[in-house]
Amino acid sequence: MIKQALISVSDKTGVLEFARALSGMGVNILSTGGTAKLLAENGISVTEVADYTGFPEMLDGRVKTLHPKVHGGILARRDFAEHVSALEKHNIPTIDMVVVNLYPFQQTVAREHCSLEDAIENIDIGGPAMLRSSAKNHKDVIVICDPTDYSQVLGELSANQGEVSYETKFTLAKKVFAHTAQYDGAITNYFTSLGADKQHATRSSYPATLNLHFEKVQEMRYGENPHQSAAFYRESNPQVGALANYTQLQGKELSYNNIADADAAWECVKTFDESACVIIKHANPCGVAVGASPLEAYSKALQTDPTSAFGGIIAFNRELDGNAAEAVAKQFVEVLIAPSFSEKAKQIFAGKQNVRLLEIPLGNAVNAHDFKRVGGGLLVQSPDAKNVVLAELKVVSKKQPTPQQLQDLMFAWRVAKFVKSNAIVFCANGMTMGVGAGQMSRIDSARIASIKAQNAGLSLVGTAVASDAFFPFRDGLDVVVAAGATSVIHPGGSMRDQEVIDAADEQGVVMLMTGTRHFRH
C-alpha cells in the first residue's frame, strides 16, 4: 500500500483531482515549487520537498529534488535487507509513487527566435533523474509521466486496497524510459543543430546527431510481402491532417501496403481546394478528378483506368455522402478515406465489413523531413511541399494558353507530383485522361499513358500534359503531341530546352515551364 507520493509537474492537467484522491486515501504528498503552491491553495495537504529534506531549493530552482533523501527513498529495493537497513540508518522514508512531467523543452525550441538561454532554462534535470530512478525501481515505485494515466492508477488503487498491479507498474516504467529518451533526444537534436558561433545565430535543419521518436500503433500480419514482418509507428503528436491521425470506422486490420497507399492517396487529395477524388494503386494515382460533388469527382476519376482501380485505395477531401457511397460500393475497394462519412454512407458500407473506412481530419500537415533507408545509413530531406502558382509559370512557346488550358495544365501538374518518376499525365476538364508512371524512359511513360487512355476509351485530343521533369530531347514531346496533346507543362532546365521549345512551336503546341522538378522514387 502506498504511503508517500512525490508530485512535481509542469503540465498541471488533472493534478488537483489526482492529488486530492491520493490525499483522501491517506497518502502523504511531497511536492516542489509551483505544484506545491497549487495544491496548498486548493486545500490539499502537502509537504514541501525543501522541508522534507531540510535542504532549501537553490540556484533559481535548478536544485530541488537532487538529494539522497529523495532518491534514496525512490531507489531502495524493499526486498533487499541492506537497502532497508540503509534507509533506517539515515532516516529516509520510502517514496512509493513519483508523478513528474518535464519542463517543456520541445515546445520552447519550436518557438520562432528561441534563444539558447531560453532553451537551456527549459532543460529539466531533477525531473528526468526522478523519473529514471522510479522506472528503474518500478517493482516498488509507481511512476507517472503522463496525466492520461491518472485515472487508471486511481482506479487500481481504489479497487486493490492501495496497490497497483506489477503489469501496470511495468507499463508505466516503459513509458517513462521512452519519454526521457525522447526528451534527451530532442535536446541532442537542438544542440547539435546550432552553429559554433557565440551567438548561435545559425540553426541547421539537419543536426549533427539525429534522434527520432515514434510510438508503435500496431504490428502487422506481414510487410510489403508475406515473408516480411512489419509494424506501424506514429509520431507522438502528428499534425492535423496527417494520415497517422486516422480513425478506422470499420473493416479488417490495415496492412503495410494499405497504409503506404492510403498515405499516397490522402497526400494527393488534400492538395485540392475543389471536391476531389483520388484512386491509388501501388502508390500511384490511376485516377484523379475534381467535380461539383464527391459523386462527380469519383465518377470522373474512375473513368481514367477502371481496370487498375479494382482493389485500390480511394480518397475524398469532402464528406462521403450516400450518393457517392452507393457508386463506390459497386467497386471492389480496399480502403476508403474521407474527412467524414455521412450516416447513409456508413449504412451502405456496413454491409461490406471487409472495406476499411478511415476518417482523417483535413489539415495542412507536412512532414518536417522525409526519410529513406539505405545500407547502413539514412537519407533525410525536406518534403516536396512546393505547389507552383500561376505567377511562377513561364510561357515559353509562341502560342499563348487559353484559360481552359491553364486550368488543365495546373491540374495535370498537381497530379504529376504524386506519380512515380518518370511521370507523364494527360488531363482535361478536371480529370486525368492517362497516367504513365515509373518508367526508366520518359518516352515509355508517355506511350503507356496514351495506351491507358485508349484502353479506357478516352480521347486525348486537346488534352494538357504534365511531365515531372524536363524533356531531355524533343522525342518525348513528339509522342504526347502525336497522342493529341495541345499544351504541355514541365520544369525545363535541360541543355536542350530550346530544341524542345522549337518543337512545340513547330507543332503549334502551348508550352509552360515551372522551374520546379517533382521526381518521386
Swiss-Prot record:
**Reactions catalysed according to its record:** (6R)-10-formyltetrahydrofolate + 5-amino-1-(5-phospho-beta-D-ribosyl)imidazole-4-carboxamide = 5-formamido-1-(5-phospho-D-ribosyl)imidazole-4-carboxamide + (6S)-5,6,7,8-tetrahydrofolate; IMP + H2O = 5-formamido-1-(5-phospho-D-ribosyl)imidazole-4-carboxamide
Q: In which pathway does it act?
A: Purine metabolism; IMP biosynthesis via de novo pathway; 5-formamido-1-(5-phospho-D-ribosyl)imidazole-4-carboxamide from 5-amino-1-(5-phospho-D-ribosyl)imidazole-4-carboxamide (10-formyl THF route): step 1/1; Purine metabolism; IMP biosynthesis via de novo pathway; IMP from 5-formamido-1-(5-phospho-D-ribosyl)imidazole-4-carboxamide: step 1/1
What range does the record give for the signal peptide? none
All copies of domain MGS-like, residue ranges = 1-145
Which Pfam families would you find in this protein's record?
A: AICARFT_IMPCHas (PF01808), MGS (PF02142)
Q: Name one GO molecular function term.
A: phosphoribosylaminoimidazolecarboxamide formyltransferase activity
**What does the UniProt keyword field contain?**
Hydrolase, Multifunctional enzyme, Purine biosynthesis, Transferase
Q: Which InterPro entries match?
A: AICAR_Tfase_dup_dom_sf, Cytidine_deaminase-like, MGS-like_dom, MGS-like_dom_sf, PurH-like
Entries under CDD domains matching the protein: IMPCH
By its UniProt entry, which SUPFAM superfamilies does this protein fall under?
Cytidine deaminase-like, Methylglyoxal synthase-like
EC numbers, comma separated: 2.1.2.3, 3.5.4.10
An example GO CC term for this entry is: cytosol
Locate the transmembrane regions by residue number: none
**Any single GO BP term:** 'de novo' IMP biosynthetic process
Domain statement: The IMP cyclohydrolase activity resides in the N-terminal region.
Assigned protein family:
Belongs to the PurH family.
Any idea what this protein is called?
Answer: Bifunctional purine biosynthesis protein PurH
Q: Which lineage ranks, top first, belong to the organism behind this chain?
A: Bacteria, Pseudomonadati, Pseudomonadota, Betaproteobacteria, Burkholderiales
